[in-house]
Amino acid sequence: MTSTFALVLLLGGMAVCVATGVFGGYSERANHQANPEFLNLAHYATSTWSAQQPGKTHFDTVAEVVKVETQVVAGTNYRLTLKVAESTCELTSTYNKDTCLPKADAAHRTCTTVVFENLQGDKSVSPFECEAA
């Protein structure tokens, strides 16, 4: 009887995790555009990635956060879909989301990346995958 009860609890807990999207896969985040944490992650990812691109002279910047999905692992994966454009800030300067605005004539690209934040708060950015402008 005790083992049956434990099995029911285990299966019930797994069903809740699967239904809420906590168990394994990515979950889309609602109200992502109103959440400053996601905007800060988007700017962090975009500035970090663009600074590592050979031949670039200017940072890219975030024009829009299109979609945010999260996955809980040993930390959190944030899969970000962004519209990015070349900014007015040169790579020799310090990136600032408030002053590094898109150039007026810059093409906007839709890009996807994953930012992993471990349990200590350290972040890493996967390469961007962008659609042609």
UniProtKB/Swiss-Prot annotation:
Disulfide bonds join C89-C100, C111-C130. Detected in saliva (at protein level). Detected in salivary gland and midgut. Keywords: Disulfide bond, Protease inhibitor, Secreted, Signal, Thiol protease inhibitor. PROSITE patterns: CYSTATIN. It is found in: Secreted. Disruption phenotype: Combined, RNAi-mediated down-regulation of salivary cystatin-L and salivary cystatin-L2 in salivary glands strongly impairs the tick's ability to feed on hosts. About 40% of the ticks cannot feed and die. The remainder show much reduced blood intake, appear unhealthy and display strongly reduced egg laying. RNAi-treated ticks show an impaired ability to suppress the host's immune response to tick salivary proteins. InterPro entries: Cystatin_dom, Cystatin_sf, Prot_inh_cystat_CS. Belongs to the cystatin family. This is Salivary cystatin-L. It comes from Ixodes scapularis.
